[in-house]
Amino acid sequence: MEKRVRLILGLACGCLAGAAQANDFGITAKLGTLGMGVEGIFGLTDQFNARLGFNRFDFDRTETIDDIKYNLDLKLKTVSLLADWHPFGSAFRFTAGLMNNGNELSGASATDGLTVGDTFYPDVGLNAKLDFDATSPYLGIGWGNALAADKGWGFNMDLGVLYQGSGNVTLIPTGANASLVSPADIAAEEQRFEDDIKNYKYYPVFSFGVSYKF
């Protein structure tokens, strides 16, 4: 994971060097399915920009997975390095890049008894954790070029897909009889959990924001 973070930071430094030569810079505040975020926008050429951003949002929800009710805490956290191509210098753009993906889902069930795998265990609950590939590719389209004007305010929108992998599930038994839960039942329950959330492999990204060019 550290190597991947260093790779993203190294690419970002290259973008910053190119932006310094181009002498174009802007910022964006945005809101979307990755949470609330801020981006620096760096002009590379008349048609290409680079963006370095950070997104974060936390919220709680209750969800039933494989007939087990969990109180879940969803933490969205990504660091993005994106390249925008504006054909003919237009506002429309194609976007590709990488995100350091810290998105994570964690939570717990009640400890009054439940079925783990195919076995019912009284006075048992489960703590759950779900995370994804540390480095995730992104592809999308969008509208808005903050660096097109001499300076001032603008609006932008992104629509795309973040491929974050199948997800890694860890379940830990809790409660008075936690020690009785067999590893085989835990492994079976983890597989069912992963099957239930397999659609999270492709995470839809939509955002809109306000930008300013200096």
Question: Where are the regions that the model predicts?
Answer:
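Outer-membrane beta-barrel channels and translocator barrels
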Residues: 45-47, 88-90, 146-150, 203
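Repeated loop/turn-to-beta-strand initiation elements of outer-membrane beta-barrel proteins
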Residues: 25, 48-50, 91-94, 153
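Residues on the lipid-exposed face of transmembrane beta-strands in outer-membrane beta-barrel proteins
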Residues: 29, 38-42, 81-85, 96, ...
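Outer-membrane beta-barrel "beta-signal"
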Residues: 84, 88, 152, 201-214
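Transmembrane beta-strands of outer-membrane beta-barrel pores
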Residues: 31-35, 54-60, 87, 98-104, ...
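Sec/Tat signal peptide C-region and signal peptidase I cleavage site
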Residues: 16-24
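Solvent-exposed loop/turn segments connecting transmembrane beta-strands
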Residues: 27-42, 149, 200-202
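Extracellular/periplasm-exposed beta-strand and loop segments of Gram-negative cell-envelope proteins
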Residues: 54-81, 103-136, 165-205
